[in-house]
């Protein structure tokens, strides 16, 4: 993937950059793997905002992605590499030998015509999925399960990868994109390689309206609000808030640790690096 810049024909265009989409091979998704999703606007079933700064955006269709890779020992050929509006990575359409079609997250260097397979004895090449116990130490992996059969939860966004560090008894140690080292059951599935679309992090939005197209609403600073809306609000003229930074609900923020001790804490070997 490469980044495309524009001539400064307007203030919004001046710093705007965009993907060239040169790796995309088709513009129409597979109809059998597409469903409609209604936008929530960040509201729950009571109509109350549970996720702030969400709303609007272009209408999108959700592509059903195979995160489980549970179709074992049947080879599949990559039919196309496509854009997915719901994620930063590209997706690849697989045509299995038995006629079934599925989408997967497209790893780096996966091309149309390549063959991939999910198997305990699969080759160590990008796109193949194996149980972690069958993967050699030091291998770059993505799409990692946390619970057997639940589907991949770790290292799924553009350009991310994890590394297999060690194996002991029924657990493997995996170094995650954040720097955290975590124990994962060795029977969990993982996919070989790094997620594609590496230049996603280099894209510059360029203007406020483009964020609105993506369904992102403005984030208003607390010091710009009234006292009724935020603990930092109010005051005569411009103020700094008058207290240590807090959320709208009065909880300390900007570095304050809010994570509660969970049962999964014991699986963290090394905390993430800042």
UniProtKB/Swiss-Prot annotation:
Pfam families: Ribosomal_L2, Ribosomal_L2_C
Annotated segments matching region Disordered: 223-258
Gene Ontology biological process terms in this record: cytoplasmic translation
Cleavable signal peptide: none
Presence of keyword RNA-binding: yes
Domain of life of the source: Bacteria
Assigned keywords, A-Z: Ribonucleoprotein, Ribosomal protein, RNA-binding, rRNA-binding
Disulfide bonds: none
Cellular-component GO terms for this entry: large ribosomal subunit
GO molecular function: rRNA binding; structural constituent of ribosome; transferase activity
InterPro entries: NA-bd_OB-fold, Rib_uL2_dom2, Ribosomal_uL2, Ribosomal_uL2_bac/org-type, Ribosomal_uL2_C, Ribosomal_uL2_CS, Ribosomal_uL2_dom3, Ribosomal_uL2_RNA-bd_dom
Subunit structure: Part of the 50S ribosomal subunit. Forms a bridge to the 30S subunit in the 70S ribosome.
Functional description taken from the UniProt entry: One of the primary rRNA binding proteins. Required for association of the 30S and 50S subunits to form the 70S ribosome, for tRNA binding and peptide bond formation. It has been suggested to have peptidyltransferase activity; this is somewhat controversial. Makes several contacts with the 16S rRNA in the 70S ribosome.
Family matches, as NCBIfam families: rplB_bact (TIGR01171)
Record-stated family: Belongs to the universal ribosomal protein uL2 family.
Protein name (record): Large ribosomal subunit protein uL2
Organism listed in the record: Geotalea daltonii (strain DSM 22248 / JCM 15807 / FRC-32)
